[in-house]
Amino acid sequence: MRRSLQRSNQHHKKALQKLPLGVSSNFRYWGEDKTIYIDHGKGGRLWDIDGNEYIDYRMGYGPGILGYADSRVDEAAHKGMEMGGVFALSTKLEYEVASRISKMVPAAELVRFSNSGTEAVMAALRLARAHTGKDAHIIVEGGYHGVFDSVLWYADIEEWDAAKGDPPIEADSEGIPHILKKLAHFTPLNDANYLEDLLKRHHQDIGAFLIEPMMGNCCSITASPEYVHAARELCEKYNVVMIVDEVKTGFRVAKGGVQELMGFKADLCTFAKAVGNGYPISVVAGREDIMRRIGDGVIHGGTYTCHSVSLSAAAKTLEILDETDALQTIENYGAALQQGMSRILEARGIAHSFVGHPSMGGLFFNSTPPGNYRDWLDSDYSFYDTMAPELHDLGVLCEPDSREPWFICEAHAKDDSLPQTLKAFEQAIDTTLETMD
């Protein structure tokens, strides 16, 4: 049975009068008759303005690590509200939260706060340039690092002829200065030889290597530990700052993030999504000698940085993640969900694999998991694209684009989300098979 989006569709027409695309982020626009407007969220569930209830596996693209409207975090945020909000001065709480982050992430010797992942990566890139005196940077193909000009580029490999050299670099958006193109270089994930060749040719210009070891906007495709350690050595060899973007993986895949899982330390690292369980806060952290450049030539700031509400929420969220078994609960649920999905798919002879970590896993309809963005691009993802809307009608909300992982929160494990999800998944798979037959 198709759910009704009548009220969402009506509101969308009204919203178009004041908001481009009717929304406040391009990624929230799903089409004229498919864009959803939310009434409220609680735990691992959302309710839209039509009254449809969803088990949510987007979780705001990852921030909801504990669940929506978590009483523990919201009570702390309320106390933060009573502090007063924005002072353009500092509070003792900043030191306390920074100390917690340094405890959980050894690479985070010094910490600075911002409000979004984009801001954190901007700061990291500025620090890397200041530290090395080199302006260019490397981005891993398929990686996502926010919506600022320096990183809104991609390697156009769809029509690329490898015999003609490196793939052309194109802008993701209009309005980006073309002069910035010469500062962006790209490398495929899990190919250390390619990375080394790129550095041999351009190391005199490259000051930063930006990497998501688990690509949060590309099916959670994951770097091998061997690749990460090889990249670490190459960065040291060629005087390149290794920036590990943990905006999505940080405080989710492990207390110490993906760096803990793979046993290495970044020069600089960024965090955002899970830090405050949905309250706006982000982090740039790293080696003391690099971070000390802030105030010694490098500018970093922001009026709303360390708002008392967000900082209080972060303090409580990180306390829960550090001192309880919340992350293990999340991982166990994600593993059980994937096992249940596998049973359903195997019973129907559907080749598949899961990528990444159970807390933010990608579903890939091929028996061989992708090792980089090129593998995903060469795959047939039409089955996923057909399945996702069927799941939405059955009350399970995943991203319509297969590149976005399934995000798990602690609250999913506290109700009957798992059996409900698997029942809906089985129905959606059968409907998709009939549709594509």
Feature locations, PLM:
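Conserved N-terminal phosphate-binding loop of PLP-dependent enzymes in the Aspartate aminotransferase
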Residues: 1-437
